Amino acid sequence: MPPKVTVDKASERAKQNLGTLIMRCRGTLSQSQLAKRVGLPRSNMKYIEDGVNAPTAEVYDKLIKELKPDLQTRQRMDRLYMAIRKVPPPDICRTITQNKDLVDAMRKLEGCNLTPSQIESVAALFASFQENREGEPIK
C-alpha cells in the first residue's frame, strides 16, 4: 500500500490566497500577458493563480518585479510565499547571500522572538544603511 501523503491545509490556503493576490495585482493585464512577461506558459500561470501550484523563487521574483504591488500587498504576498515555501522571499535570500557575515549575526537570534519595538529598531538600523550618491540617508 502506498504511503499516505499529508496535506498541509495552511499551505494549501496560502497558495490559494497568493494566487488570488497575484490575480488582483495584475489588474487589466491578461493572464497570458503576465505569463509571457515572467517566462511561463499560460497554463502554469493559471495553476498559480488558481492556487494549485506555488511559484518557484525565480518566478515569484519576476512576478513581484512585474506586478509592483503596494507595500501592504507585497508584505502579505511575502508572508504567504514564506508559509508555502518555508524560506524567505528571493530578494531577502539574495541580500543574505551577498552579505555572508550577516548569517552569523542572524544566528544570534536563534530561539528569540523579537518584540515589535525590537523589529522597529532593526528596521531603522537597516534603513540607515541605505544612502544616496551624496551619502545622505534616504528618507
Give residue spans per PLM region:
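Short, low-complexity, charged amphipathic interaction modules
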Residues: 100-137
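Short alpha-helical DNA-recognition segment
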Residues: 27-47, 77
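Short, charged recognition helix plus adjacent turn
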Residues: 3-4, 75-110
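DNA major-groove recognition helix of helix-turn-helix/homeodomain DNA-binding modules
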Residues: 56-76, 83
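A general alpha-helix detector
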Residues: 21, 44, 58-63, 88, ...
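Recognition helix of helix-turn-helix/homeodomain-like DNA-binding domains
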Residues: 39-55, 62-63
